[in-house]
Amino acid sequence: MKKVMMLALALGASTSLAAPFVYPANWTSNKPGDVQTGGTFRSVNLQDFKTLNPFVSSESPNLPAVLSAGSLLGYNPVTGNYAPYMAEKYTQSADKRTFTFDIRKGMKWSDGKPITVDDWITAYTIDSNKDVGSNTFDYWTINNQPIKVTKVDSNTLKVVFPKADVTAIEFLSGIFLPQPTHVFMPVWKAKGAQGIKDMWTISTNPDNIVTSGPFMLDRYVRGERAILKKNPYFGEWNKDSAGKSLPYLDGIQINIVADANAQLAQFLAGNLDTYSPDNRDKLAQVKSAMDGGKVKGTLIPNASARASSDFMVFNMDDSATFKTKLFSNVKFRQAMSMLMNRDAMVDLALGGLGEPTYTSVYPVYKDWIPSGMDKYKFNPTAAAKLLAELGFTKKGSDGILVDKAGNKLEFTLITNAENNRRQSYAKVIQDEAKKVGVKINVSAIAFNQMTTLLDAKDNFGRRNFDAIIIGLTGGGQVYPVSGPSVVECKGLGDGGNLHMFNQSNKCRFPFETQAVNLFWKGRAEFDLAKRKAIAAQIQRNEMENQPYIQLAAQTVHFAWTDRVQGEYNRPQINSLNASTLFGPRDIALTWIKR
């Protein structure tokens, strides 16, 4: 999953003295002279945050990412390039495997302690340990060979990749984040992996949470809000183009509003600073409110395709039961894909503002998606034929298909209660399946409960589900075909892995092994055309085997009030340069107009 913090290119030459990182002027639509400091940015999240622990967090969005400054390199949305951020400079070896970084001097954690080379060594030591179960554990190997990190001296860090990897630059900007040695290493040495996993729960005293980013946690009220306050040390090493310390804001308030319609009401009432309408009706309400002067602000409809996915995934951990054996049969999954009325989903759930999807590559990356991906598009007649080949030729008195052994074609489909869009998808699926004799019982539960069901444990009783509708967001732009935590099927960490359909810790199906091999082949390919050809093979493999039955994707729309300023310039406003919580802006450059 993409965790790249959007950070600008440093302006000015490096010196032997501590040099701050300078955000360039073209990162914001405002001039430094326009800026007013102070104030609180008001945002919203659909569910409670699960943890403050950066090593075990797997949700999106999550507070550890919000509280992080970023890493060695940063991504520039204006140029699309990567450049030094927490590193002052770096070199790359001729074979593209070794990166050597000079760490920026003068950086501090939110408790005032210096950020040093040791903090990357701590992150490497803990994050790459399988027993910790980090969501990014799989990123620490390249085709099962480990990435190695060493401290050269007090200011120099070396990262050696086992093979040349085209996505290394993204790993160094968004995955390999420093963690405070003075906080985590004593626990690691005394209590090991379990001690780390027990740290920084959502109930931990905010005074004990140490962060690198522009904000730190002030307080968290479960079910109500997260309050962030300015990190007083961030501005010492982060400046705007006029030399002013960042961030401009005093703080951020993230309200927990577990209903998408209630979020809209909050924005229309003037209680939120930014909002992203997700269907035609909500977009129309926002436009009407702005046209009528009820809300003074900016609306950008259809800014771009969305960099996210929604899909249905079956539990294929084994074939021990009638249902898991059925779910493990590719003909069944192909049939289910042909029962997905994606056009109806776009019309009913998205108000026509979206498109059907057939591949895990987000539609925003259209030039990466090959033709012919809709082979298993909506076709109930063909779906019924495949189900008949599996023995479901007759219906019982209740209208449900049944095989010769008396097994009914019935399963439960779970999605998260906070997400109206996915619940609408589930209703469309349920209705279409019923027409051919498949009974689907839809259940909506809390998102955190749903992700707990998906997480792997030695006792697979925790994965007691049939099918789930969920989604992914983020990912890399260099090679936008998923990531190791989604692809790898063995050597899985204890929780947080995203190989959702099979958590047996073994590759049960040939297509899984094929996907793994193709994925790593593409990572080693630096020729763009050849890399896209490999990505096409991966997507065709997905299409034929349907491990994740893709549904539909929204177009993205952005709205914000005149109260909040500092958004990107219009060419940079798209789903790739926006966050769920803050919209199309860098939060360090955001300010409140009063």
Curated annotation (Swiss-Prot):
Keywords: Signal, Transport. Gene3D superfamilies: Dipeptide-binding Protein, Domain 1 (3.90.76.10), Dipeptide-binding Protein, Domain 3 (3.10.105.10), Periplasmic binding protein-like II (3.40.190.10). Pfam families: SBP_bac_5 (PF00496). Residues 1-18 form the signal peptide. GO terms for cellular component: ATP-binding cassette (ABC) transporter complex; periplasmic space. InterPro entries: Peptide/Ni-bd (IPR030678), SBP_5 (IPR039424), SBP_5_CS (IPR023765), SBP_5_dom (IPR000914). The keyword Repeat does not apply. Transmembrane segments: none annotated. Belongs to the bacterial solute-binding protein 5 family. PANTHER family: OLIGOPEPTIDE-BINDING PROTEIN APPA (PTHR30290:SF9), PERIPLASMIC BINDING COMPONENT OF ABC TRANSPORTER (PTHR30290). Probably part of a binding-protein-dependent transport system. This is Probable ABC transporter-binding protein DR_1571. It comes from Deinococcus radiodurans (strain ATCC 13939 / DSM 20539 / JCM 16871 / CCUG 27074 / LMG 4051 / NBRC 15346 / NCIMB 9279 / VKM B-1422 / R1).
